[in-house]
UniProtKB/Swiss-Prot annotation:
Self-association state and partner proteins as the record states: Interacts with GDB1.
Protein name: Inhibitor of glycogen debranching 1
Residues bearing PTM Phosphothreonine: T65, T132
Further information: Present with 639 molecules/cell in log phase SD medium.
Species name: Saccharomyces cerevisiae (strain ATCC 204508 / S288c)
The keyword Phosphoprotein belongs to this UniProt entry's keyword annotation: yes
GO BP term, pick one: glycogen biosynthetic process
Length: 195
């Protein structure tokens, strides 16, 4: 009794088996296919074959991003601005160039701004937030605790009492808290103590 699932296909009935025999017959190998030449492969010109009607689209040269080109175009933009400024001194004109974005960033970083430029005190939209000043403008002296002031001087100098470390702030970074916690655990477990 033979199982029909275990039988191999007959040579005469399987077309894929017949095609695979082409590569197994070493006495008569198949012919090599011709490799297309690079000089005649879809290139426009006199040596290209006229087989296809559609010519490939030539590569479009993008705007140069070389440093010298950018500097030259920046100088040309400055010259245009100066000539425009001479003809119309009251009007503020702006020309865009290849380095317009970089110039904008540079101007934002290095331009000095006044508080009056940024304040909106004259505009009342009903949704403004009034900011209270942190320190009074009446006195420029820093405010110290009375225990730190020197009673012998006129109040311009301050001294720190000996024996107590100065408090820099009440809030410590979480990394310091973690380091203190580790130190306490190591001390309790005597991990790094001498044996």
């Amino acid at each position: 009794m033979t199982d029909p699932h275990l039988n191999t296909p007959q040579v005469s009935t399987s077309p894929t088996f017949e095609r695979s025999q082409d590569f197994l017959n070493i006495d008569e190998p198949p012919c090599a296919q011709e490799t297309p030449s690079v000089s005649t492969f879809n290139l426009p010109g006199p040596s290209a074959p006229a087989q296809s009607v559609d010519k490939p689209v030539p590569m479009i040269r993008r705007r140069s991003t070389n440093y010298m080109d950018a500097l030259n175009s920046r100088e040309q933009a400055r010259e245009r601005e100066s000539s425009i400024g001479e003809h119309a001194p009251g009007a503020e004109r702006r020309s865009s160039g290849p380095m317009d974005f970089q110039n904008t960033i540079h101007n934002m970083q290095y331009r000095t701004t006044n508080d009056s430029d940024l304040s909106h005190a004259g505009v009342d939209m009903g949704d403004s937030i009034s900011h209270t000043p942190i320190c009074s403008r009446a006195g420029n002296r820093p405010i110290f605790k009375n225990s730190y002031l020197d009673n012998n001087s006129n109040g311009n100098s301050a001294r720190v009492p000996h024996g107590s470390p100065p408090q820099l702030g009440t809030r410590r970074k979480s990394s310091f808290k973690y380091e203190d916690f580790k130190k306490d655990i190591y001390n309790q477990l005597h991990m790094f103590g001498e044996k």
